[in-house]
C-alpha cells in the first residue's frame, strides 16, 4: 500500500485505499482565479494526487498561508468510476462549493463541480477530456432539416467554448509530454562525467602586479607613449671638448692678429696700412666701424727675453727689407727659438 510519509516523522500522512485506481485519460482540473483561467492540471496518470503547501510531498503545490503542508488528497474510485476528495485534517478545511468536508472522510466530486482549499481564492473545477467534435454537429445528424435554426441559436457559443477548452487542454497535455520526455531521456542517456576542478581556495604568495603605475609612483601612466633614446656620455664630452678647442684656438689667433705686432710690431706703418684697421694702444679694434675692446685671453709666453737694446740701435728701418704683402698676410705663431735661429745669449743677459 502506497503512502505519503512526512519527512519529519515516521507517521504516514495519507494511506492510499485499496479501491483506488487509475482515472480515464483526459481527466483534469481547471484552476480559476476570479474570472481568469490560470492553468489546467492533468490528473489521469496516478491513483491519487496530494494537494498542500509542501512541494516535496505534494503533487500540486498551493502557495497560500492558510493551507496545510499536506492539505487534501484526490482519489479515483476504480469500481464506481468516480472521483473522491479526502481532507487530511487540515487547519482551515477543504470545501466542495461552500460546504466544508469532514476530515479523513472521502467525498464524491461530480464532474463540473468546484472545490477550494483553505482561504485560497483559487477554485479547482473537475473536467473530463474535451470532445473533438462539438455537440452541435452530432445534433445535426439526428435532427436533419431543423439543423439550421439550432445551429444559429446554440451552435456558435458552444463551439467557441469547447474550442477554448480543447486548446487549453492540448496546451497542458503538450507541456506534460515534453516534461516526461525530458525526464525519460535523462534516465536513458548517460551523461559524460565532468571533471570537477579543485574547489578549494588557494592563495598565492607572490603578488602579481598588472599595472605598475598604480603601485610605483616613479612609473608614469603614459610610459608606453614616450620614446627614449640613450646617448653615450663619453662621446658627448669628446665632441664638447673638440669644439671648445677649435673655438679657443681661433680666438687666440684672432687676438694675436689684432693686438700683437709680431716681430715688426715696433715699426711705423706704411702708406698702404694707413687705410686699414688701426690698432689701439689700449687694445681696441675697429669691428663694424666701432672701437670695441678685445682683451688678449691667452698672451704669448717668451721663453728667452728679448734684448731691449737691439731695437734701439737701429731706429730707422731699411725700406728695402719690409714687404707690404707679407704684413697684410695672416702671421703664424712663432716661438723665440724659431724666430732667432742660431742666436746666442749675450753676457749682459746672464748677469
Swiss-Prot record:
Determine if RNA-binding is one of this entry's keywords. Answer: yes
Q: Write out the ranges of the annotated region (Involved in PP-1 inhibition).
A: 191-200, 331-337
- Region feature Interaction with CDC5L, SF3B1 and MELK, mapped onto this chain: 1-142
Gene3D superfamilies in the record = 2.60.200.20, 6.10.250.1290
* Start and end residues of each stretch annotated as RNA-binding: 330-351
Q: Which residues lie within the region annotated Disordered?
A: 314-351
Q: Name one GO cellular component term.
A: nuclear speck
Residues modified as Phosphoserine: 178, 199, 204, 249
**Domain FHA residue range list:** 49-101
Q: Extract the PROSITE patterns matched here.
A: FHA_DOMAIN (PS50006)
Subunit and interaction comment: Interacts with phosphorylated CDC5L, SF3B1 and MELK. Part of the spliceosome. Interacts with PPP1CA, PPP1CB and PPP1CC. Interacts with EED. Part of a complex consisting of PPP1R8, EED, HDAC2 and PP-1.
Q: Where do the segments described as Interaction with EED lie? A: 143-224, 310-329
Organism (species): Mus musculus (Mouse)
Briefly explain the null phenotype: Mice display a retarded growth and embryonic lethality at E6.5, due to defects in proliferation rate.
> Which GO biological process categories is it annotated with?
cell population proliferation; mRNA processing; RNA splicing
Q: What is known of its domains?
A: Has a basic N- and C-terminal and an acidic central domain.
List GO molecular-function terms, semicolon-separated: DNA binding; protein phosphatase inhibitor activity; protein phosphatase regulator activity; RNA binding
> Gene encoding this chain?
Ppp1r8
Protein name per UniProt: Nuclear inhibitor of protein phosphatase 1
Q: What does this protein do?
A: Inhibitor subunit of the major nuclear protein phosphatase-1 (PP-1). It has RNA-binding activity but does not cleave RNA and may target PP-1 to RNA-associated substrates. May also be involved in pre-mRNA splicing. Binds DNA and might act as a transcriptional repressor. Essential for cell proliferation and early embryonic development.
Pfam families of this UniProt entry? FHA (PF00498)
Amino acid at each position: 500500500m502506497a503512502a505519503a510519509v512526512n519527512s519529519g516523522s515516521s507517521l504516514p500522512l495519507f494511506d492510499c485505499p485499496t479501491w483506488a485506481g487509475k482515472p480515464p485519460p483526459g481527466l483534469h482540473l481547471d484552476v480559476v482565479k476570479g474570472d481568469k483561467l490560470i492553468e489546467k492540471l492533468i490528473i489521469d496518470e496516478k491513483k491519487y494526487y496530494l494537494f498542500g503547501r509542501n512541494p516535496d510531498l505534494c503533487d500540486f503545490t498551493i502557495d497560500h498561508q492558510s493551507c496545510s503542508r499536506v492539505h487534501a488528497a484526490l482519489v479515483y474510485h476504480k469500481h464506481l468510476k468516480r472521483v473522491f476528495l479526502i481532507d487530511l485534517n487540515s487547519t482551515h478545511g477543504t470545501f466542495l462549493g461552500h460546504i466544508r468536508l469532514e476530515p479523513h472522510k472521502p467525498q464524491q466530486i461530480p464532474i463540473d463541480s468546484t472545490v477550494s482549499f483553505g482561504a485560497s481564492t483559487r477554485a479547482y473545477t473537475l473536467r473530463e477530456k474535451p470532445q473533438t467534435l462539438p455537440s452541435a454537429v452530432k445534433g445535426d445528424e439526428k435532427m436533419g432539416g431543423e439543423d439550421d435554426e439550432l445551429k444559429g441559436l446554440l451552435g456558435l457559443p458552444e463551439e467557441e467554448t469547447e474550442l477554448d477548452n480543447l486548446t487549453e487542454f492540448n496546451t497542458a497535455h503538450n507541456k506534460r509530454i515534453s516534461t516526461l520526455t525530458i525526464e525519460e531521456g535523462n534516465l536513458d542517456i548517460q551523461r559524460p562525467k565532468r571533471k570537477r576542478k579543485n574547489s578549494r581556495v588557494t592563495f598565492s604568495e607572490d603578488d602579481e602586479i598588472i599595472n605598475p603605475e598604480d603601485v610605483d609612483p616613479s612609473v608614469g601612466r603614459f610610459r608606453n607613449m614616450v620614446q627614449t633614446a640613450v646617448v653615450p656620455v663619453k662621446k658627448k664630452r669628446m665632441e664638447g671638448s673638440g669644439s671648445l678647442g677649435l673655438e679657443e684656438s681661433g680666438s687666440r689667433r684672432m687676438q694675436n692678429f689684432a693686438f700683437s705686432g709680431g716681430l715688426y710690431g715696433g715699426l711705423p706703418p706704411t702708406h698702404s696700412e694707413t687705410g686699414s684697421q688701426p690698432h689701439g694702444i689700449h687694445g681696441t679694434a675697429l669691428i663694424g666701424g666701432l672701437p670695441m675692446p678685445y682683451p688678449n685671453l691667452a698672451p704669448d709666453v717668451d721663453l728667452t727675453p728679448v734684448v731691449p737694446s737691439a731695437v734701439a740701435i737701429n731706429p730707422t728701418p731699411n725700406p728695402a727689407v719690409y714687404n707690404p704683402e707679407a704684413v697684410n698676410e695672416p702671421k703664424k705663431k712663432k716661438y723665440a727659438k724659431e724666430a732667432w735661429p742660431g742666436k746666442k745669449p749675450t753676457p749682459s743677459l746672464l748677469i
